[in-house]
């Protein structure tokens, strides 16, 4: 039933596009994080000097001097410089944390998109497991009368597929595991080990970042997490490709 929805040729096109996309996206995100880290490191001293000058001007200005009354540092003896330097370091660390968090949020969203595409590939290769997923969902008699059994079931399936977009990262992985009906812990990706607990931690981090509940996230940690996220995308792509014995193909232009 609904075998007409299967299309291994389209699945092969998607495999090639997905593989290229994963490699390109990982390279761009990790490289940009590295460049930002280097840029901030080189600019740190110059920014510190500018911040110190700005603090001194504020302390000496008649309009703003009142805000520094009772301060333990002064614009006259140079003690303000250490305060300015500490503030600069705090602000730059916050900037780097923000950039690191943004990189992880982007990579997380990309992995979700990859999983959705992989789920689509599984439907193109074998619709049967998907029909099992919706076997307990009702199909109205009126829909069957109006369109016939197969179109009614296809409509129900399409609605179910649309609903998956709202599912979280780990739920999408669970659905992929159900469809593949095999272990998802091992693939042919070198130097990679599937770790559901680590993915859960990354998923929680993404949620915290989205709601501004976490601010101390280092670039080095982000680079490791982001690399793991993209390796995970390749891991699941490899599982799907080998499960259905797929080969990549170039989509005709």
Regions found by a protein language model. Give the residues of each.
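Polyanionic, low-complexity intrinsically disordered segments
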Residues: 1-31, 191-253
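Intrinsic-disorder-associated interaction segments
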Residues: 4-15, 22, 29, 41-48, ...
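Low-complexity, compositionally biased segments
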Residues: 10, 29, 48, 54, ...
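Helix-loop junctions and short alpha-helical segments
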Residues: 62-200
